[in-house]
Amino acid sequence: MEQQKQKKRKVVSKSKRTQSKSASSLPLDLTSEILLRLPEKSIARFRCVSKLWLSITTDPYFINLFETRSPRPSLLVCFIENDKLFVSSIPQHLHSLQNSKRSYSSSQLFIVIIWNYQKDVGLICFKTSKMPIVWNPSKRQLITLPIPRLSWNNIIVFLGYDPVEGKHKVMCLPFRRSSDVCQVLTLGPAQEFSWITVKTYHKHCSDYQSSGRCIKGVVYYIAQVYHTHAWVLMCFDVRSEKFDMIKLHADIYREILITYEGRIACVEKRTTKDDYIALCILEDAKKDKWSSKDILAPFGHFDERLRTFFQLKGCTHDGEFIFVSSTFRKMDYILFFDPVKKTFRRFELKEIADDQARVNNGDPYGPIFAFCAFLDHVESQMSLQ
């Protein structure tokens, strides 16, 4: 009997060695390709399977490739109520609009900062007074970065991404204070966080946090030149960490920058007033060349309140413009406008408002501290821990 047990143990042990050898003999590129086809939650769970899988799924190349292959981007809607952050992920494309997936988390840190943010490649960056914070909604992780400069009483933060080297960088400027330097931090292991000083060579100040956008490795934001007080578009190359400056048209919303057909665009002030979306599109940064485009959008025929209570948040990869109100008190839906088909569609906020009512004494339209929407959000495998 004892000999049979020993023989059985040897067979089992041999079987395990065979399986282990078979698994380890699988080519790395094939293993990576299989993992890339899995959903984000499955990848997170499979990291504990082996050190090899952990190494593959945390490699920057894998993370960048996963993000480019992610399903269609979503509209991330956030609002704060009673110190809680509510997050809802809404598919932007038409066929899945009714099937929104929701997740909720809470943090005391969000109470004063949600209006002041930057987003890029699955990560969101914002700040509380002097402290920059980076948030990965997909992994429900956030990390507080070191204070850039003690002498800066308040700051503005921008998040940039270099697609060539696959690096995220946080850049920081003093809020409403002219400066010819900025602080830059490259995201990586938490123990290696450190700011470096970068000369801008253009003394300027900016207080329009929401105007920042990163396109093809360049961070754009609106600022005012120190000596002339002229409004300009500042450009920060994430990879080389060099600055440039472009002249701006006068009659634009200085708090709004959008991405339109892969280019940076400003929004003129006559937008919505004349049933047009009026854009100034940057064609050539080196030559300060801009083009104008008027897109007919009959807001008044759809809802007269659009002229007053809605703000253009941007243009999706599919070419739809998205308009969002700053509070549930004024509007109860998010508006999608297709400029090609000249059609409007709306996503009702009723379900989100119902969730709010549970924490607001049954009133679904009570006061909300902040309401924000992030376009073209994709899941990110980057760990902040």
Curated annotation (Swiss-Prot):
Region Disordered, as annotated, extends over: 1-24
Compositionally biased spans, kind Basic residues: 1-19
**F-box domain sequence ranges:** 20-69
> Pfam families from the xrefs?
F-box (PF00646), FBA_3 (PF08268)
Q: Which domain of life is it from?
A: Eukaryota
CDD domains of this UniProt entry?
Answer: F-box_AtFBW1-like
In terms of InterPro entries, this protein maps to: F-box-assoc_dom_typ3, F-box-assoc_interact_dom, F-box-like_dom_sf, F-box_dom
The identity of this protein, by name, is Putative F-box protein At1g47765
In which organism is this protein found?
Arabidopsis thaliana
